[in-house]
């Protein structure tokens, strides 16, 4: 019986040292090590993969799903447990979808795969009024179909290609437009209780999947074939975060880390903390006096010319 196998020590995957000392080759090797390390760490931290698992790797044809499949295959060769991978693509019959691209790629790398063809595009276009967003219904239909395919293939886990930036964007979207603090969990059980969904790229920043896709020259399929205008809010938030990270490097990473360090007593959710019955007990509380303290934050190195004067008390 394997309990939370450790993938974090196989960061080198099956790397070969670059034959030449060209800068781009060194960068590629460093990036591959980093991707394997971060995915391995996520798998270990959240016990994503266990002995005998059959992982359904959901493939959209975008940079993130290609990167996820590539890294999982590399980790599979040296993992402390045995598991299977099957790449699955849902062909929703969107106009112009190049249905030959993914099968040809899967055959070229020798991975088991399944193409599920379901014309959800026509259903969505028929049901959703003109000018309204189609992504919500499309997503629900796609999820139901993929769960059915997972059952048919005997898969124990469903792997999605959401990366760190997707998770932070989702948190911000829910805060800005939904009035709640909710992101994307690294691992969850589906609503019907039958499927475990994992996000192996949860520690990986988007810039790394972009760069890796460029290095590997993956045959990318565009994500706008359906013509939907949904996601404008997500695009806007994504641009905001990217611009913010340029001005204040490390802020997006800090926001991501914050999602794993929730101080429930300092939020406002009565379901998480009993504020109504909070009373003085006479027992010292290390967080108690902080209610009156101004919390000191590190000064950003990206603010040139700012001199911080330390005042003596």
Curated annotation (Swiss-Prot):
Transmembrane regions: none
Name the UniProt record assigns to this protein: tRNA-cytidine(32) 2-sulfurtransferase
EC nos: 2.8.1.-
Family matches, as Pfam families: ATP_bind_3 (PF01171)
Enzyme kind, highest EC tier: transferase
Lineage, highest ranks first: Bacteria, Pseudomonadati, Pseudomonadota, Betaproteobacteria, Burkholderiales
Pathway involvement of the protein, from the record: tRNA modification
Cell compartment(s), UniProt: Cytoplasm
Catalytic function, reaction form: cytidine(32) in tRNA + S-sulfanyl-L-cysteinyl-[cysteine desulfurase] + AH2 + ATP = 2-thiocytidine(32) in tRNA + L-cysteinyl-[cysteine desulfurase] + A + AMP + diphosphate + H(+)
């Amino acid at each position: 019986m394997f309990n939370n196998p450790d993938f974090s020590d196989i960061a080198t995957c099956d790397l070969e040292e670059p034959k030449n000392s060209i800068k781009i080759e060194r960068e590629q090797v460093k990036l591959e090590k980093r991707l394997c390390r971060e995915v391995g760490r996520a798998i270990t931290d959240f016990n994503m993969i266990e002995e005998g698992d059959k992982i359904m790797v959901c493939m959209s044809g975008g940079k993130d799903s290609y990167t996820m499949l590539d890294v999982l295959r590399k980790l599979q060769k040296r993992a402390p447990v045995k598991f299977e991978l099957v790449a699955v693509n849902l062909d929703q019959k969107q106009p112009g979808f190049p249905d030959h691209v993914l099968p040809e790629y899967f055959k070229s790398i020798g991975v088991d795969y399944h193409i599920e063809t379901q014309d959800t595009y026509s259903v969505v276009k028929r049901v959703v009024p003109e000018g309204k967003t189609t992504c919500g219904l499309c997503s629900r239909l796609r999820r139901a179909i993929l769960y059915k395919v997972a059952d048919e293939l005997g898969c124990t886990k469903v792997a999605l290609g959401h990366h760190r930036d997707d998770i932070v964007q989702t948190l911000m979207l829910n805060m800005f437009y939904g009035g709640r603090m909710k992101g994307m969990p690294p691992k969850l059980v589906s609503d019907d209780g039958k499927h475990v969904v994992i996000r192996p790229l949860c520690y990986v920043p988007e810039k790394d999947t972009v760069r890796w896709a460029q290095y590997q020259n993956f045959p990318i399929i565009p994500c706008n074939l359906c013509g939907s205008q949904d996601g404008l809010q997500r695009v806007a938030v994504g641009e905001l975060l990217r611009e913010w990270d340029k001005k204040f490097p490390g802020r997006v990473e800090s926001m991501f880390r914050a999602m794993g360090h929730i101080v429930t007593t300092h939020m406002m959710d009565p379901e998480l903390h009993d504020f109504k019955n909070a009373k003085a007990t006479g027992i010292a509380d290390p967080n108690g006096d902080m209610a009156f303290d101004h919390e000191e934050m590190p000064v950003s190195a990206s603010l040139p010319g700012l001199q911080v004067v330390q005042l003596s008390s």
